[in-house]
Amino acid sequence: INLVTEKLAFATDYCGVKSGRDVDKFKEMNLHACDGVNVSCPAIEESPVNVECKVKQVVELGSHHMFIAEVVGVQISDEYMDKTGKFNLNSTGLVAYSHGEYFALGDKLGKFGYSVRKK
């Protein structure tokens, strides 16, 4: 699983609508494959976060399949880590996809427990 940034949104959309049988998506979008660390599956070098998984179960849902997987590794580009070694979501420009639309992520809404803190 390669997380998507705003810079990669166009390439992500292209890769989602084009078939790998018809076009070399990496070449067309100038993407580069890199070796996985814990799995024998390539990752996208330009992605700031690569999540490596092993498929445990495939559930057939009629129109599509749902994959249940175990996360066996996570690689994060150093530029997205803060000084304490934590992932800095604000600096990544990550994108989410929902119901055919892309959304920018990253605005901090609060810290865990903020809903019950005394004022």
Which functions belong to the PLM regions below?
Residues 1-119:
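Basic, polyanion-binding surface patches
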